[in-house]
Amino acid sequence: QKKDRFLGLM
């Protein structure tokens, strides 16, 4: 899920 948040920043 943390990776998903990182993708959201993109």
From Swiss-Prot:
Tissue distribution: Expressed by the venom gland.
Disulfide bonds: none
Pyrrolidone carboxylic acid: modified positions: Q1
Modified residues (Methionine amide): M10
Keyword Secreted appears in the UniProt entry: yes
Main subcellular localisation: secreted
Coiled-coil portions: none
Keywords: Amidation, Pyrrolidone carboxylic acid, Secreted
Source organism superkingdom: Eukaryota
GO CC annotation, single: extracellular region
Compartments reported by the entry: Secreted
Family designation: Belongs to the tachykinin family.
Name of this chain's protein: Tachykinin-like peptide-VI
Species this chain originates from: Phoneutria nigriventer
Organism lineage string: Eukaryota, Metazoa, Ecdysozoa, Arthropoda, Chelicerata
